[in-house]
């Protein structure tokens, strides 16, 4: 459900935490409002909040490739470790650079892609 939180909606939010479980649920106007309200509304941006599904898909791929089977508990534990680590890194980067959680998460993602391309080349 994309772009359902626009500027006026973001101004009216009464939540303490906005965890974006969908892809792109906020408009750029809403993002500006949420950045101004960051002391009131703690934003967990979509790029971070909903990455668990992608991570678990990767786990499935690894298990299939290596003919492994992880229990549900093992998958959940591995997911918790990665999500907790990513959350901490985004929060640290946001505080260090004085930017929103979304800007921090996006910058970190772009930097990781850039590093991978540098290491492997454009067409591996």
Q: Model-found features: residue ranges?
A:
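Adenosine-phosphate binding glycine-rich loop
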Residues: 11-124
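Rossmann-like NAD(P)-binding element
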Residues: 1-5, 10, 20
């Amino acid at each position: 459900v994309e772009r359902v939180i626009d500027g006026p909606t973001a101004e009216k939010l009464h939540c303490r935490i906005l965890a974006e479980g969908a892809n792109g649920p906020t408009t750029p106007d809403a993002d500006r409002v949420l950045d101004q309200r960051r002391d009131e509304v703690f934003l967990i941006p979509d790029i971070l909040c909903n990455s668990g599904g992608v991570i678990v898909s990767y786990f499935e791929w690894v298990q299939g490739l290596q003919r492994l089977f992880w229990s549900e508990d093992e998958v959940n534990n591995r997911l918790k470790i990665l999500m907790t680590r990513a959350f901490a890194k985004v929060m640290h980067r946001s505080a260090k650079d004085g930017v929103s959680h979304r800007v921090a998460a996006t910058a970190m993602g772009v930097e990781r892609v850039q590093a991978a391309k540098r290491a492997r080349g454009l067409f591996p």
